[in-house]
Amino acid sequence: MISPTGNESYEEFLNAFRFSFSSVNSYNNCPRCFWLSYLQDPKLEQSENAFAQWGSFMHSIYERFYGGKLDFFDICAEYEDQYHQKVTIQFPPNAWVDLNKKYYEAGLDAIELIDDLPSHISVLDIECKFRLKIRDISFVGYADLILQNTETEDIIIVDHKSKSKFKSKAEQKEYARQLYLY
């Protein structure tokens, strides 16, 4: 287990630990899961799964499109051509729906909605890594897309979610915490 060493207190140890939205959320949902995922030594092996592969693939499409490396007219063809090379693991069985079909179609539906940004919105950064301290506690985060309204100078932070729709306003509020941190 990773824990304080020598004369280091738990407070000093936690102040030295770099938190992320995922680690804070993990602790909030299940402290034991947090310990197993972030503090256990040696670390647990993380196995790949279809959900993670699909999410990474979707993020790569958004990143390349908004970064100017993937043309609007090629985006659907890129998704269809690359899908089975990027999502190589089958989704788990589900009694009510074929998750393989559902996620394929959901991804296609999502990218069909991608549109060029309005002329007054500019891209400041894509997959922006940032570090900050809040009351001496270190945080790290990755913003998918940082935009600016050139008319108002407002900053817009976009976080692409690869999950299905929010089940409730409470769940949506829980996910909004990530944007507040950013």
Model-flagged regions — what are they?
Residues M1-Y10:
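Accessory/regulatory regions of helicases
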Residues I2, A16-N29, I137-Q148:
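An acidic intrinsically disordered interaction segment
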Residues E11-A16, R32-L44, Y83-V87, I157, ...:
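Short amphipathic alpha-helical segments and their helix-coil junctions
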Residues F19, Q53-F57, K102, E174-R177, ...:
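Generic recognition of stable, solvent-exposed alpha-helical segments in well-folded globular domains
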Residues F21-L70, Y104, E127:
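Nuclease catalytic cores
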Residues Q46-A50, A95, L99, K167-E174:
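Conserved aromatic-histidine-acidic binding/catalytic patches
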Residues F57-K129, K133:
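A non-catalytic, helix-rich entry segment at domain boundaries
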Residues C128-Y182:
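Mg2+/Mn2+-dependent nuclease catalytic core
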